[in-house]
Regions:
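Alpha-helical transmembrane segments
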Residues: 159-172
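Solvent-exposed, non-transmembrane regions of membrane-associated and secreted proteins
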Residues: 1-152, 173-175
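Hydrophobic H-region at the start of alpha-helical membrane spans
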Residues: 150-161
Length: 178
């Protein structure tokens, strides 16, 4: 069943966390990697949370590669919210689990997804260490503004079409006047 929620405000993601990482579970949310620490926080813990990218039905961890060092994500378990600050972003081969080990005295969570998008030959690891929780941190800060190229292109196309129509109308009026 569901054990908690992972939320990543900077990329607008909030997913339920389920026990295990079966395909069935990853179709509906994030999975807790069996063998890693439970995502309840505490010294000398390292929880690994994994989710798919680019499912037709849901965004999941599609934009995980947009996270930067210093961004925060949150885990909510048993009514408690824990904040983590991203401190390492790394791409590894699927069998390389070195970066998922417990580090003595540390409280860590690593978010994992497949990469590169569509090929899935490697794993993107985004690690965070526990920091003090402030409710204000969960407000979505548009830190990584995506340039909406599609919108810009449509606006430019509209402007060009308007200018073109205007020029055509002017030419037609001139020709009528002769």
């Amino acid at each position: 069943g569901m054990m908690g929620i992972v939320s990543i405000p900077s990329i607008d993601v909030e997913l339920p966390i389920y026990h295990y990482t079966t395909n069935e579970i990853l179709e509906k949310g994030a999975g807790h990697l069996f063998g890693s620490s439970l995502p309840v926080g505490g010294k000398s813990t390292h929880s690994v949370i994994t989710a798919h990218r680019g499912l037709p039905s849901a965004k999941m961890f599609t934009d995980l590669d947009e996270l930067r060092n210093g961004d925060k994500f949150f885990i909510e378990v048993l009514g408690q919210k824990i904040a983590y600050k991203v401190d390492r972003i790394k791409t590894v081969k699927p069998e390389d689990t070195q970066d998922m080990k417990i580090i003595e005295g540390e409280d860590l969570v690593t978010l994992v997804t497949c990469t590169p998008y569509g090929q899935n030959t490697h794993r993107l690891l985004v690690r965070g260490h526990r920091v003090a929780y402030n409710a204000g941190d969960e407000v979505k800060e548009p830190t990584h503004r995506r340039i909406p190229w599609a919108h810009i292109l449509c606006i430019m196309l509209g402007v060009f079409l308007a200018v073109d129509c205007y020029m055509l109308a002017v030419r037609l009026r001139r020709n009528k006047g002769r």
